[in-house]
Amino acid sequence: MAQILPIRFQEHLQLQNLGINPANIGFSTLTMESDKFICIREKVGEQAQVVIIDMNDPSNPIRRPISADSAIMNPASKVIALKAGKTLQIFNIEMKSKMKAHTMTDDVTFWKWISLNTVALVTDNAVYHWSMEGESQPVKMFDRHSSLAGCQIINYRTDAKQKWLLLTGISAQQNRVVGAMQLYSVDRKVSQPIEGHAASFAQFKMEGNAEESTLFCFAVRGQAGGKLHIIEVGTPPTGNQPFPKKAVDVFFPPEAQNDFPVAMQISEKHDVVFLITKYGYIHLYDLETGTCIYMNRISGETIFVTAPHEATAGIIGVNRKGQVLSVCVEEENIIPYITNVLQNPDLALRMAVRNNLAGAEELFARKFNALFAQGNYSEAAKVAANAPKGILRTPDTIRRFQSVPAQPGQTSPLLQYFGILLDQGQLNKYESLELCRPVLQQGRKQLLEKWLKEDKLECSEELGDLVKSVDPTLALSVYLRANVPNKVIQCFAETGQVQKIVLYAKKVGYTPDWIFLLRNVMRISPDQGQQFAQMLVQDEEPLADITQIVDVFMEYNLIQQCTAFLLDALKNNRPSEGPLQTRLLEMNLMHAPQVADAILGNQMFTHYDRAHIAQLCEKAGLLQRALEHFTDLYDIKRAVVHTHLLNPEWLVNYFGSLSVEDSLECLRAMLSANIRQNLQICVQVASKYHEQLSTQSLIELFESFKSFEGLFYFLGSIVNFSQDPDVHFKYIQAACKTGQIKEVERICRESNCYDPERVKNFLKEAKLTDQLPLIIVCDRFDFVHDLVLYLYRNNLQKYIEIYVQKVNPSRLPVVIGGLLDVDCSEDVIKNLILVVRGQFSTDELVAEVEKRNRLKLLLPWLEARIHEGCEEPATHNALAKIYIDSNNNPERFLRENPYYDSRVVGKYCEKRDPHLACVAYERGQCDLELINVCNENSLFKSLSRYLVRRKDPELWGSVLLESNPYRRPLIDQVVQTALSETQDPEEVSVTVKAFMTADLPNELIELLEKIVLDNSVFSEHRNLQNLLILTAIKADRTRVMEYINRLDNYDAPDIANIAISNELFEEAFAIFRKFDVNTSAVQVLIEHIGNLDRAYEFAERCNEPAVWSQLAKAQLQKGMVKEAIDSYIKADDPSSYMEVVQAANTSGNWEELVKYLQMARKKARESYVETELIFALAKTNRLAELEEFINGPNNAHIQQVGDRCYDEKMYDAAKLLYNNVSNFGRLASTLVHLGEYQAAVDGARKANSTRTWKEVCFACVDGKEFRLAQMCGLHIVVHADELEELINYYQDRGYFEELITMLEAALGLERAHMGMFTELAILYSKFKPQKMREHLELFWSRVNIPKVLRAAEQAHLWAELVFLYDKYEEYDNAIITMMNHPTDAWKEGQFKDIITKVANVELYYRAIQFYLEFKPLLLNDLLMVLSPRLDHTRAVNYFSKVKQLPLVKPYLRSVQNHNNKSVNESLNNLFITEEDYQALRTSIDAYDNFDNISLAQRLEKHELIEFRRIAAYLFKGNNRWKQSVELCKKDSLYKDAMQYASESKDTELAEELLQWFLQEEKRECFGACLFTCYDLLRPDVVLETAWRHNIMDFAMPYFIQVMKEYLTKVDKLDASESLRKEEEQATETQPIVYGQPQLMLTAGPSVAVPPQAPFGYGYTAPPYGQPQPGFGYSM
């Protein structure tokens, strides 16, 4: 038997299953302030999110795009606190509002909700409390203690009153995690540092103390071990005994040496301390004694956050895998566990009493019996009273105390017992009775009242009966508390509180006979009866049948009261109340039509007989109500045409309830009946419902009656909202035909939906008196030309003036164009232009007139506009064109007029007068146009002057292009004329730059010589001299030396450098020498002329250090190392030591390099110099000097030199150097190359570097030193990233056994990880398959199952593959594998266990097919397992198809309880085949879901009589009585025939059976049939039949029974009449007392009595004509 556990462990959910990234499940990103919410910060893509998981609805996490450093949810409500930097904010998520915000001066390193409205904030220096209430800011509580400096804060706790505050942090010290706490007293304002890892506060009430004590619990893992401390903080409350301190050891397993406590919660319900450690262990301690109750590991991952679990008074937490786990006390098991497993009965008793826990019943009973046997009755009473769950508070205990006699002068043990019980709480039922009986006998009723008020007694019916004899009112109170309805109602009646009966009965759910009560009340007072009836039906479920209540009203002909009652009772308008609604309306339509009209108008009812009520309404003259109820179109058309009798607004709304076809028919009928009277209402209906009735249908309707007025008003109501072009056109038509010209204008102007061409043509044809609509259409849709032609030809010129003056003056140009086209008079056109002033485009007007060569027509108008001061360019352009054409002094106009458009006018002049075009273009700076006209007309002088004056580089660039054919004549004019004339330096500068930019050096030289050498004002200009030399360098190098010697005011260094760049080295050397720049001169000789000899001579002549340095550098570059070193020494220049070192390295001149570096070291103690010197010593193999040098003071990079020596395989030197700097990693590598493997391993151990271990390991493998290789490999395999490379290295060289040996040894390492177990499994699958199963069974939870799955599949290890699929919960694949490879993988138990867990139910049917093929004898066992999810119909169909139904008969029998049709029919077929009629009959009786008739028809032809009998039975069950009886008669089943005839309740069938028996001369059967079909046979028919066949003897028992029945009925009627009279007399004198058993008299017994004895009655008394008071009756 499994051991009982004192805890209940539960996994609530997996965060990864909710889409939470595992990387975000950690202390810094996940918070849980309570068991209500979990809050996670995530980053999805580039967006930061906060995920909130409501633990009551975990499947629907809330995601919000929030960027924050931290987020914590309020413990109880959807309020979130967010921290970003130093900014803190609190938001209400449900209200979507910000509640508070604050910016801290210091960073908040930790924060936590410590109550529902307070957040604790921890900074590096202090702790603050921030309340959500009001506008308060964070309040500083205390400064952090120095002992917490540098600690990571992991928790903050307070006691219930927030008088004691605790801050907890951890830090790494001496290879262990040390916990530090700061306990702060708010009252005393002092702190105490404590070493501890986890802590909590608790309120605990000790036995004998009046007040609770505040306890502080904390756990610590120190160097000496773990401890749990429980102490009381502060001064104990007055009268309290102080809590004794507790300090107990906390056990940590040997394999968890680095484990330590991380969380603590205390259960207030059970007074149990829950302690959780980093390695996932849970410890339970008793708070009072400190005893360890239980310890176990609940998680393989660290649980990093916890909170109290309120639902179970336990602890809930989240681990790093995302599991949300909870642990709580298992109340049913903890006491037995403490008693039996811990063997601590004292603790068990203490906890059972303290926390009211079950499980210690035997201990309490034993203790009670022992005390009772000792005579210690007071203690025994305490034990019995305090026993948990009231296990000893039994009648037996009371009897035992009653049996003890009271001692004189002492309280009896029984009263002591009751006294203790009363002090503790409420007495139970038996205790209350036993206590009250003597109290009432003593007349101390006031004690009973006191106990009732204090709720000390458990009330019961027996207690009420006991009290009633003393005080009925007090008894009523007891009955009420005990919930005894019949007695309560009886007491209400006895105390005169009848009005409370209904309220009380509804309250407690008690149901008396309400109709009987109502009749009695109605007889006394109809009004009170109405009120009482309303009380009966005022709830959703009436207390009595409303129909019966109405019958009671109608018995007394109370129409008005009945109406009022029904209106109230039927207000909920339920479908089941339809007949009552009809009855209500019918009675009022007949007696009070106005009341019925009001009822119908209120639309209270919808379930009455509408057709019947409609006819009644029409007869009563309520035509509107009749229409509301009519459904037949003929009835509706008959009524609807009488619109003068109907409310128009109602009628319009009524059409909304009709179908489209009916609505159109009704409208047609209304227009046909009286179009004048009904047109308005028809228009209203059409307007409102045009969308449903379709606008086209309505238009056709009005047009069919030629009602354009109706069409106008209808379309007018919808045209503003319609987008249909036809609607707008029809509306325009209708408006025209009804003379609504203004409306035509409006719609033409505002509508965007009509077809303009169609409307234009219609308006032309309509010949309206007002042409404004046509004008609007043509103006809007650009038919202006057509409009002008139409108006002009129809002599409607005034509308042209109206159009351009009032409608759209901007259209004047088009109108003028049209008038010119129709040869209108110029005077008319001029007048028209003058009338329309400035409201049109002059450009367009000029264009229209100019197109027709009539520009002069505008001259007077244009001059008038200029005279008026018009500055519009278009006006001046037109005037300029006219002046140019007429040669009216145009040049003066073009130079002086500032308003015309130069480009337009210039273009106009180009062909007429190029000079005028130049004037216009120059005035407007139209560069391109001016250039083109000058080029075309050879005006180069004008162009050159314009270009010089213009000073535009881009413009110069465009004319100086090589592709320009006019460039040469233009340049000649620039050189000869334009520049000679100018005195402006800027013009010269721009021109020269333009020539430079255009890359015209020869032309530029020509230009510059004219400026510089011809003694002009610009001769001494430095820039021009520079430019002349530079241009000569580029274009004519023969002149350069001449210019250098002739000119003196140029920039020598720049010119020299440019000469160098153009390979004029001698000229550059001459410039440097002329200006004494020797370093540059020697540089030219070295770098450009390349003559080191001349350079050496020049250096000796100058003898300057800088020159020697230049020469040395050149020599070094030429590979003349020795000469270069000599030159550097002469220059006294060690600055180029790097280049010297590199040159020596390249050439191998190490001896020379040593000399140079020794010289350089004297000058400069550079690290590089000393480093290179060491390397040079190593290269020259001067190891003794090298060792002496590195042991002395130096600045060399010895590590770097060692690496270089290592790279160049100088391992002896490298060994010295690495040893000097203690670089054990590289030293180990060096030793490997020297073949010193053991020393290399020692070096690697000192280096403790993965790379080093790997290198040494690989070397050892190559050297076949596998023992050393394994030592190295054990340090590598613990790093998951390195494992694959190591394995590949071994495998590539074929060392499989050694690799497996190493991995097996590594499994025991503390840092063994999943990759090691996984790779070992893969290796087993390849090389040692026989060991794989054992490995997987031991370590399946630690391998990467998907990876091992692939390996097992590749290795064809099918059994192992199934095992892995099972553990990975891929049950579908496991089943498929077993079925595909049954020889290796199939195991019966495993298959049946896994198949129930598959997700794809289709595998069930594959499994069935598999078993049928391979394991047919086990098929039924499989089907039993599959049956809960199996589609039995499909399964049966399958077995039927393969003809294997008999094989699965046990399965079919087991699932027949589902009453599945296919199963039933298959089993029935099997039973028929097996001829098992008993099983078939049993199946038919138990399971009815099959084709009864088909089976019966099949069985009636069966050769066995029992099956034909079953066929008759089935026909009977399907009410085919005649067929059933006929089948019985055919097979001589007389008893069955009589029984079926009796059950049919068919008199004719019974009488036919009687006749058949007589025909067959079965007289005994005739007598038996009379007995069996007694209720169906008519006595007169039986008498006649018996007399005719002379068998009166066989019929005589029947007649005796009939006579007996009639006589008994008469006697009963006589007795009931007498009884009725007696009760009537008694009722008149007796008040109504309810609650007694009621006698409900009926019209007679209605239960048929079996005829065997005594014979039943078949008579029913006729109903009375009038209801008799005091009787209930049924009809």
Curated annotation (Swiss-Prot):
Region annotated WD40-like repeat 5, chain positions: 196-257
Renumbered residue ranges of the record's region WD40-like repeat 2: 68-107
Chain positions found as N6-acetyllysine: K856, K1441, K1501
Origin superkingdom: Eukaryota
GO cellular component, one term: clathrin coat of coated pit
Renumbered residue ranges of the record's region WD40-like repeat 6: 258-301
List of residues that carry Phosphotyrosine: Y184, Y634, Y899, Y1206, Y1477, Y1487
Membrane topology reported for the UniProt record: Peripheral membrane protein
SMART domains: CLH
One annotated GO molecular function: protein kinase binding
Impact after mutating K500E: Disrupts spindle localization
Location of the region described as Flexible linker in the Swiss-Prot/TrEMBL record: 480-523
Keyword Zinc tagged: no
GO biological process terms, semicolon-separated: amyloid-beta clearance by transcytosis; autophagy; cell division; clathrin coat assembly; clathrin coat disassembly; clathrin-dependent endocytosis; intracellular protein transport; mitotic cell cycle
Region feature (Binding site for the uncoating ATPase, involved in lattice disassembly): 449-465
Location of region: Heavy chain arm: 524-1675
Function summary: Clathrin is the major protein of the polyhedral coat of coated pits and vesicles. Two different adapter protein complexes link the clathrin lattice either to the plasma membrane or to the trans-Golgi network. Acts as a component of the TACC3/ch-TOG/clathrin complex proposed to contribute to stabilization of kinetochore fibers of the mitotic spindle by acting as inter-microtubule bridge. The TACC3/ch-TOG/clathrin complex is required for the maintenance of kinetochore fiber tension. Plays a role in early autophagosome formation.
Protein name: Clathrin heavy chain 1
Source organism (scientific name): Homo sapiens (Human)
Gene: CLTC
